[in-house]
Regions:
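Conserved phosphate- and dinucleotide-binding cores of soluble alpha/beta proteins
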Residues: 3-19, 24-28, 39, 71, ...
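HTH-adjacent hinge/linker in prokaryotic transcriptional regulators
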Residues: 1-17, 21-95, 101-121, 134-137
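Short, Lys/Arg- and Gly-enriched loop/turn segments at beta-strand edges
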Residues: 100-101, 217
């Protein structure tokens, strides 16, 4: 059913015939999957297909986690390698950032007993905070705000208060699209505001995204393109795309 959600995410609507053709399944299987997803309130059934109850970015994070999972794991390891013991790290929400939090938890040097935190993570994602709180040597700071029910991210002015009073060594920000000309973009303007502020409070701001987002744009920009200094992505980025980002001033790390 994840594959059906992926198709739905592309255009916001899907027909049974499309599912049959693209996924090589029977019409009965396609209808059964649509009915099951409708029962979970992930889509609305129509005659001959379905429409999304929300646009692609609003699909619950548990369904987005499986998309490009190997790439996200490699990106997470590359991101973790940039972090030094004792750093203050900003982590916005999203599946790639969640993978980075997992990579932090697997680092032996961050699990060593210490009178001071081996790492401080500032996040607006409650799922990431819940994951890291199990690591006693990692200090977890939550921004505050109102929970976005599908992405688990905290948004709103309460987040601004916390972020406005701290400094961050390195921030990792996931995106819905990145383009050399338009920069980084996300679908939700409230999340964009938090991501942008976190990047501005950081000495180094890093975009983490799989290559499927390259060349795409979403609704809300994350400030000026020069706000970020590094892009970490997977090895499906083309040579032309990499050159375009490097010409725009971004360091590109291929995981």
């Amino acid at each position: 059913m994840n594959a059906v959600l992926d198709l739905l995410a592309e255009s916001g609507q899907i027909e049974v015939d499309d599912i049959v053709t693209k996924l090589d399944v029977s019409a009965a299987t396609a209808r059964r999957d649509l009915d099951a997803l409708a029962s979970q309130q992930l889509l609305t059934r129509t005659r001959g297909g379905a429409v999304g109850q929300s646009v692609a970015y609003d699909l619950p994070i548990r369904y987005k986690r499986e998309q490009h999972a190997p790439e996200k794991q490699r990106i997470a390891l590359a991101a973790s390698a940039l972090v030094r013991r004792g750093d203050v790290v900003g982590l916005c929400g999203g599946t790639t950032s969640t993978a980075i939090a997992t990579a932090f938890g697997a680092r032996p040097d961050l699990a060593e007993p210490s009178p001071e935190p081996t790492l401080t993570v500032v996040t607006n994602a409650i799922n990431i905070a819940a994951q890291l709180v199990m690591r006693p040597q990692i200090k977890t700071v939550v921004t505050g705000g109102v929970v976005h029910p599908r992405s688990y991210e905290l948004v709103g002015p309460y987040s601004d208060i916390v972020l406005g009073q701290i400094t961050i060594d390195i921030a990792f920000v996931g995106v819905n699209g990145i383009d050399p000309q338009f920069g980084a973009t996300v679908h939700d303007e409230r999340e964009a505001a938090i991501n942008m502020l976190m990047a501005r409070r950081a000495e180094h701001a890093v975009i983490v995204t799989d290559s499927s987002k390259i060349g795409r744009t979403a609704f809300a920009t994350l400030g000026e393109p020069t706000l970020f200094d590094t892009l970490i992505t997977d090895d499906r980025i083309t040579r032309e795309q990499r050159t375009a980002f490097e010409d725009a001033g971004l360091r590109v790390i291929v995981a």
